[in-house]
Amino acid sequence: HTDLTGIFVPEHGLFGAVAAGDDVDGAEYKGVKVYSLYGAARRPTPAMLDSIDVMTVDIQDVGARHYTYVSTMAYAMEECAKAGKKFVVFDRPNPIGGLMEGPLLRQEQTSFIGLYPVPLRHGLTIGEYARYINDTQKLGLDLTVIPMKGWQRKMYWQDTGLPWVGTSPQIPTAATALYLSLIHI
């Protein structure tokens, strides 16, 4: 038996419709409390985590280092590790494939739009990135990655046969995810 006690949302909100940089207000969705992790709180607080046993992440990253969804996940992982909460990631395809390219982020440049020394086009799935964070940051998080089926590193989104759901107003198509990985902001 599972009870959904809270929904934690990243920069672009629950449905990916909030513009970049805009505040994401917490509210309720179908009677469940929604907590914004973009704005005043970028990390779940102990009070937010009190009512949960496990945090699940089912979010589509775009494969570019400066897209903030990985940072939001990383901060949630850190706080769940401190609080002794389990963490489950539902893996998803990297829409721009498994190729890594571009410069590595230098330590002095780290920020919310780039926390780790990975290439601009990082080539990882969200599940692989979660494992990378847990291992390299030595979080000791009770992490489970639910694997996906059928994706191969050479595949782009259009090769998956899956419908694309825009992750933000700036990424309405899978092709725009590739363009984002080609620029450095």
Language-model regions, residue ranges each:
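Conserved anion/nucleotide-ligand pocket segment
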Residues: 110-180
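Glycine-rich oxoanion-binding loops at beta->alpha junctions
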Residues: 24-51, 64
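Glycine-rich, charge-decorated loop segments at or immediately adjacent to ligand/cofactor-binding or catalytic sites
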Residues: 16-20, 88-110
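A short helix->loop->beta-strand "cap" motif at the edges of active sites that frequently abuts
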Residues: 2, 82-86
